[in-house]
Amino acid sequence: MSSSKTIGIIGGGQLGQMMAISAIYMGHKVIALDPAADCPASRVAEIIVAPYNDVDALRQLAERCDVLTYEFENVDADGLDAVIKEGQLPQGTDLLRISQNRIFEKDFLSNKAQVTVAPYKVVTSSQDLAEIDLSKNYVLKTATGGYDGHGQKVIHSEADLEEAYALADS
């Protein structure tokens, strides 16, 4: 199949690279936006080197591409809304905004989409951790910005709990 479409991928990590490989295999051209010039997608696609929240870089990507997508949720939704043309980001930014906050995401999945989710508790400060039962295991996660294990703390012991207090208050 041959295509003259250009796909823009925000994020040039391993997932972005795999998306690019698939798109190229189908005959598309790919341009990725990533802060690292040597990101994995750079091996197969043209790269615009800029932070994910750089509106000028997002605009440049949007102007050069027929369609846009993103490889992860830590993308500037407001910036995307400011630069995309109608239909250029088929998935839109509504679900992106929901996925950027774990509290919103859990609420959406359990209450709106009626998906069964694991039990959870919203923690807004270390005071919310004061009465947890250390005979059980917990994973404290930041509501925003976490990825690949960053912004998480597994709690098994009193020592873990002390570290979790700092994360909860951040």
Specify the residue positions occupied by each region the protein language model found.
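Short, glycine/charge-rich beta-strand/loop segments that flank catalytic centers
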Residues: T93-Q100, K121-D128, G145
